[in-house]
């Protein structure tokens, strides 16, 4: 492991660890999203806690966490495997934040931020699948899982470099893992829908 790679990898994890959902809530709304709705710090629960504007701020912040270190890795590191690893490090940081005692979100927006840098067409596929699924089902969790499935599929069909396809597969696995409780609630019919503030 070269020192530039180590520095960028660690920087990616640390930036990924910044909890934008909590920062936006406390700075602008006086609300901790962990006390609202699903208790998650990501975009969907931020919509419940702060409304649309706050949710957009969280989305942009969380996507930036993935995009910025990945862009730096592509620019300054020689191997695409390194860029893919840095992208994954940002997701790990978001999901298991050093600033939140290794707890965190589910990594969906951060995954998207990385994909925007690695493959813009795959990011478009992610967004299209998310929007379609959310519009039809009103389940953000299901939309996030299916959108994450679209990433490695799109990258494979577009013949993206193998490290990017592997990134997409690992990122999908992380998204599914972090949505384990959502999947159980979807199966039980108790999952929160978009716009719902608390479970019924």
PLM features: residue spans?
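N-terminal signal-anchor transmembrane alpha helix
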Residues: 1-28
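Nucleotide and nucleotide-moiety/phosphate-recognizing core
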Residues: 4, 8, 53-99, 118-122, ...
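Alpha-helical transmembrane segments of multi-pass membrane proteins
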Residues: 12-15, 90-94, 130, 134, ...
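C-terminal ends of transmembrane helices
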Residues: 21-24, 93-103, 130-137, 180-184
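Cytosolic, membrane-interface loops and tails of multi-pass inner-membrane proteins
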Residues: 22-53, 182-200
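Short, non-helical or kinked segments that cap or interrupt transmembrane helices
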Residues: 31-43, 99-112, 139-147
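Interfacial segments of multi-pass membrane proteins
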Residues: 47-51, 73-76, 93, 108-137, ...
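Loop-to-transmembrane alpha-helix initiation sites
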Residues: 124, 140-148, 159-171
